[in-house]
From Swiss-Prot:
Homodimer. It catalyses: (S)-dihydroorotate + H2O = N-carbamoyl-L-aspartate + H(+). Keywords: Hydrolase, Metal-binding, Pyrimidine biosynthesis, Zinc. One of its GO terms (cellular component) is cytosol. Its cofactor is Zn(2+). The active site is at D248. GO terms for molecular function: dihydroorotase activity; zinc ion binding. Gene3D superfamilies: Metal-dependent hydrolases. This is Dihydroorotase.
Amino acid sequence: MTQKLTITRPDDWHLHLRDGAALAAVLPDTARQFARAIVMPNLKPPVTTVAQAQAYRARILAALPAGMQFEPLMTLYLTDNTGPEEIAAARASGFVHGVKLYPAGATTNSDAGVTDIRRCYPALEAMQRAGLPLLVHGEVTDPAIDIFDREAVFIERVMTPLRRDMPELKVVFEHITTKDAAQYVRDASGPVGATITAHHLLYNRNAIFTGGIRPHYYCLPVLKRETHREALVAAATSGSERFFLGTDSAPHARGLKEHACGCAGCYTALHAMELYAEAFDAAGALDKLEAFASFNGPAFYGLPRNTGTLTLEREDWELPAELPYGDTTLVPLRGGETLRWKAR
């Protein structure tokens, strides 16, 4: 049984850092484990221009504690009004690495998102020419579609027609949750990749309802059936370069999770690599973790691998039950429980 594993320093290809005091609270957790992260643009107001991304990047770097090394990889928030000129500026910037598609209303702070993908075709065509990736929250928002089916229907209604029209557009299917999405990415022609979270590798939808409502397991896309979780584990541990690590760590104040209308999102930045190690260990695939966490993402984005390392040791330790979060607290996924791996 492997007791210790040293891997190339990993990156997080899907992260929510928030802003202000919340940013200052959570950024060190990510920087301790990851060299770089794709930073989501769904602030209020959203990051829709290169100038806004540059300002947000400066705030992130200003919040980084002295002595810590971390590179934020910025993204823009795609809207119906995003133009080709903004895409050209993004590609030329050197710090914008993707554009995020949120279907309007699909998740936290997505109200300004896309109402009709066809309205975005001029921007998407510019992205295809520039080689700038489109990062997709792959769920339809049609209220007639069951929440557990929204990813599969998105493939049919949006992803397949989009990639038929733009076969060379680089696309990341973010935080996939179904066997449908895993198979789509595995079988797709052209430049398609996918991020997978630790919580979707470890849990099925029963986790939300065990003994009562468990709000800290509620995220979007929502956890799915066990058959889907198993398909995600198979994809992540397959060795395919198309699948890579994206925590989708999404901090919310405790009072906004434990609430009559609680926010969606799991906070995992503090212990992300421990959770991924647990998932890969359970699958008997620790030897596949380094490629998933450290190699596949840089290869897709055309970036060099990191030069540092991170070591994971089999060691029991208790995760804090809650963490400081501005003037309040947040609860990490599995807060107060014992974890079996420790990252150093």
